[in-house]
Amino acid sequence: MAPGRSGYRLRFRSGARISGDSEQTQGFVQEPGSCAEDPGGIVLKRVIVIDNYDSFVYNIVQYIGEVEPDCEIEVFRNDEITIEEIERKNPTHIVISPGPGRPEEAGISVDVVRHFSGKVPILGVCLGHQVIGYAFGGKIVHAKRILHGKTSKIVHNGKGVFSGVKNPLVATRYHSLVVEEASLPEVLEITAKSDDGEIMGLQHKEHPTFGVQFHPESVLTEEGKRIIKNFLNIQDIQVKKVSEETEIDIVSALKKLVEFEDLTFEESRQVMNFIMSGNATDAQIAGFLVALRMKEETGDELGGMASVMREKSIHIKAPSPRTVDTCGTGGDGFGTFNISTTTAFVVAAAGIPVAKHGNRSVSSKVGSADVLEAGGYKLEKTPEEMERELKETGFSFLFAPLLHPAMKHVMPARRQLKIRTAFNLLGPITNPARVKYQVVGVFDLSFASKLATALQRLGTERSAVVNGGFTDELTTCGKNNLLLVTQEEIVPMVLDPEELGLKSGDPEELKGPSDPKEAYRMMESVLKGEASRTQVETVALNAGVVFWLVGECDTIKDGVGKALDLIRTGEAYKKLREVMDYQKTLGNS
């Protein structure tokens, strides 16, 4: 872990050195204010380090201070700063540290690369290097060898951060994962390789964004300080301000769309960021959404838009990597009872946290928010209350209007359009808890592969995009289509309820009441096992797929059996009561 507390500021003096591990570390003083320039009027470098909870952060900070004595360094853990807060600090350089796990587990790191690449010079070290590869669409795979504190010879191209560096150089490696060369994005180029053929250096072809898989800050790495110095010597690129040039991007995007040309993931991100920052006019937003629909949205376009929505949302910290969501697109018009919401309580009863993202009615007569509210659930919570509830009960409803404040910029255009737009598809894949396991119901099978691609681009671990034929839920009323989505592949499947030991159901029994209180009573009856077989087994089928996705059960059939047991034993209904009783412990809003 990095020295001192998260979010500390270091102002280096000429010739400073760091030693010790307290907040009063020798060689620097902590200052509360900005450090835009020194008393002599020289503009100072501002370096923000994203700390991925790794002890090497200390060494990186020390090296930065030694090679650039007149600089300001601020260190923030990867879950304790937002994109907007970084922008306000106007850094001249950003460093993404090493750390445990994979890029998609590294908090804000991936979003930092996607947002600031091309605006601010970025250096990623080890995990940070993998973050860069992943952020632009590369795959992170197991290395040929697991190395911990071992040295290798690194051959490099002598450019960028390797300018003037000994070639080959001996470098220290601590990693079990690498960026896969076969899936390397077109925008990235390899700048260094190890003697065993692994990628050791990357650089964006157009941006000052660099990654090194090895540790330049290790004492056993040759010329590590020169690599750091080369990075810091890159001419500062200030964060782009809203300008006419930015507006041209949305106009250019519109021109492409009306010619039925697809946008890339990054292009859709740029347009979405412009829109969600409040810089687009209602006419531009409406034109973009209509043109996108007329051309037909792609998975990359939806993924790019969703990634910005996630960045702009209020982040909810999940209590477990296995936290799931059961949110669908709605829009099927069939008017089913609240299947996905009921499913959530069965899943939570098994000890798997459910961060249920949702809103009021879309296609059902009563939306998930409506039915929960009818049972006494408090929708208006602070983010801290949601996190606490999720941790203590295993369930929390993430009421979308509270957690997506940037949506205010698009609502006027959406209200005036009154047609289906890309935003009708984005809800399920923009969960503020950044869940990695989901069952995403889709009202139209033609959108399934697009949402699957978007989920893959967003870093899902193991999710399913499903369609029940006449509804955006899995049902026992016929065969269901399912796309299994992992980081490596998208696999189509057909689920036949009868092959899972379930009886063919009657679609009419899935229709729900129009009164929220009656809808809540129906949910209670299903969770008690007192509802019709079609209703109970449909919920069990959806929960069973979740159990299979998160690895709770080896097969979907086993998952269905587990779900039925949780209903029959009363555990599912008990979880509902626990969550509703928990609401009484919360203050009135």
Swiss-Prot record:
Protein's name according to its UniProt entry: Bifunctional protein TrpGD
Binding site for L-glutamine: 99-101, 130, 176-177
Subunit relationships: Heterotetramer consisting of two non-identical subunits: a beta subunit (TrpG) and a large alpha subunit (TrpE).
Chain intervals for the UniProt region annotation (Anthranilate phosphoribosyltransferase): 253-589
Residue span, Glutamine amidotransferase type-1 domain: 46-241
EC number assigned by the record: 4.1.3.27, 2.4.2.18
Pfam families for this protein: GATase, Glycos_trans_3N, Glycos_transf_3
One BP term from GO: L-tryptophan biosynthetic process
SUPFAM superfamilies: Class I glutamine amidotransferase-like (SSF52317), Nucleoside phosphorylase/phosphoribosyltransferase catalytic domain (SSF52418), Nucleoside phosphorylase/phosphoribosyltransferase N-terminal domain (SSF47648)
Homology family: In the C-terminal section; belongs to the anthranilate phosphoribosyltransferase family.
Methyltransferase found in the keyword field: no
Record's keyword terms, sorted: Amino-acid biosynthesis, Aromatic amino acid biosynthesis, Glutamine amidotransferase, Glycosyltransferase, Lyase, Multifunctional enzyme, Transferase, Tryptophan biosynthesis
Role this protein plays: Part of a heterotetrameric complex that catalyzes the two-step biosynthesis of anthranilate, an intermediate in the biosynthesis of L-tryptophan. In the first step, the glutamine-binding beta subunit (TrpG) of anthranilate synthase (AS) provides the glutamine amidotransferase activity which generates ammonia as a substrate that, along with chorismate, is used in the second step, catalyzed by the large alpha subunit of AS (TrpE) to produce anthranilate. In the absence of TrpG, TrpE can synthesize anthranilate directly from chorismate and high concentrations of ammonia.
Active site residues per record: 126, 215, 217
PROSITE patterns attached to this UniProt entry: GATASE_TYPE_1 (PS51273)
Highest rank taxon of the organism: Bacteria
